[in-house]
Amino acid sequence: SVIKVPLKKLKSIRQAMKEKGLLEEFLKTHKYDPAQRYRIGDISVALEPMAYLEAAYFGEISIGTPPQNFLVL
């Protein structure tokens, strides 16, 4: 079965950080390395915070009993 999740458009993380004057410092300290997710021999999961800076659509889902709500990109 397919469940449709209504999406909400919000400001992107990049735009919100820019408005608060935080973006420039963040970009200096968090370099984006697209090759990082392809490392071999590293069993840890590579988090790519840069990939989510442009995300502007969110949906709310509920999991469990009693339901717990989560926002997902």
Curated annotation (Swiss-Prot):
Q: Name one GO biological process term.
A: proteolysis
Q: Does the keyword Ribonucleoprotein apply?
A: no
Coiled-coil residues are none
Q: Which reaction does it catalyse?
A: More restricted specificity than pepsin A, but shows preferential cleavage at Tyr-|-Xaa bonds. High activity on hemoglobin
InterPro entries attached to this UniProt entry: Aspartic_peptidase_N (IPR012848), PEPTIDASE_A1 (IPR033121), Peptidase_aspartic_dom_sf (IPR021109)
- Lineage, top-rank taxon, reads Eukaryota
Q: Which residues form the Peptidase A1 domain?
A: 57-73
Query: Which keywords fit this entry according to its UniProt record?
Result: Aspartyl protease, Digestion, Hydrolase, Protease, Secreted, Zymogen
As recorded in UniProt, its EC number(s) are 3.4.23.3
The residues of the propeptide are 1-43
Gene Ontology terms, cellular component aspect? extracellular region
Single GO MF annotation: aspartic-type endopeptidase activity
Subcellular location per UniProt equals:
Secreted
Recorded family membership: Belongs to the peptidase A1 family.
Q: What does this protein do?
A: Hydrolyzes a variety of proteins.
- Report the protein name in the record: Gastricsin
